[in-house]
Amino acid sequence: MASETENLRAIALDPSHPTPTDVGEIYDETSDSLTDMLGGYIHVGYWEDPSKQETAEVVGDRLTREVGVRLSPAQGEHILDVGCGTGKSTAQLAGIYDAQVTGITISKQQVEVARSQYGRKMPAGQVHFQFADAMDLPFGDASFDGAYAIESLVHMLDKRTALAQIAQVLRPGSRLVIADLVSDHPCPDSPVLARYAEIFEPPLVSADDLQNLLRQAGFKVIDVTDIRENIRPSCKLFETKGLSLGGELGQKLLEIASILEEMNELGYALITAERL
């Protein structure tokens, strides 16, 4: 019987699944609506107290800080933001840690917005944004002192290659922090995961399988924290925006809201790993 990792590789080679170009074009079309909904970010928020009402910007800021604490870059270090969106998290962590951060995205629209909103407002050379595919990184070996990926691996068909590429551009001893959706099971054997699979490609991986892929790519897993309960209130942000937008995008946001609200089998992991 094929292993889960072998199955993921087969999925990555299946031409019926979306390519990086497809994903980039989706974000070209939806980034404005998503950043408006998520307080300038393109990732969910982190609630310390899920019963407390907070703004999208506050909770988005907090999730970014959770990533930053785990990465803990030193002043002046060069960090890679894998899937930078429109650049808010990139600029935020560069400012907090006085680090140099390069953000990459496969959305041309996101590159333009990031450069306009943050690239020209930060100190010269502190942030840099470019169009690049994480599965084929255009950087030299050991170019970076650390990296993070917030809700970007979930879109990548060949996660093994992406993680190997990230490992290649990191210096030994550097950290990689991942914040992303994961499943408790390797296949959609529950109603919630089945609904997720209907509207998202590629399929989710389990946290265990993601850790195995990290080890195969040359990382040591340091910590895994499941924060599904802390991000669950994000469903209200999707619901509110979906109702206001209407149409196809509005309907998809409402479906995402429903899935997040019922995500007993749908996890959200903060994974800290070290390049060996």
Swiss-Prot record:
| GO molecular function term, any single one | S-adenosylmethionine-dependent methyltransferase activity
Q: Does the keyword Methyltransferase apply?
A: yes
User: Which keywords are on file for this protein?
Assistant: Methyltransferase, S-adenosyl-L-methionine, Transferase
Protein EC:
2.1.1.-
So where does S-adenosyl-L-methionine get bound?
110, 133-134, 155
The consequence of inactivating this gene is: Abolishes the biosynthesis of communesins A and B and leads to the accumulation of desmethyl versions of communesins A and B, including communesin C.
* Cofactor requirement: S-adenosyl-L-methionine
Q: Which domain of life is it from?
A: Eukaryota
SUPFAM superfamilies xref list: S-adenosyl-L-methionine-dependent methyltransferases (SSF53335)
Question: Which BP terms in the Gene Ontology apply to this protein?
Answer: methylation
At the top of the EC hierarchy, this enzyme's class is transferase
Q: Which InterPro entries match?
A: Erg6_SMT_methyltransf, MeTfrase_dom, Methyltransf_11, SAM-dependent_MTases_sf
Q: In which pathway does it act?
A: Alkaloid biosynthesis
State its role.
Answer: O-methyltransferase; part of the gene cluster that mediates the biosynthesis of communesins, a prominent class of indole alkaloids with great potential as pharmaceuticals. Communesins are biosynthesized by the coupling of tryptamine and aurantioclavine, two building blocks derived from L-tryptophan.
The record's similarity note reads:
Belongs to the methyltransferase superfamily.
Protein name per its UniProtKB record: O-methyltransferase cnsE
Origin organism of this chain? Answer: Penicillium expansum (Blue mold rot fungus)
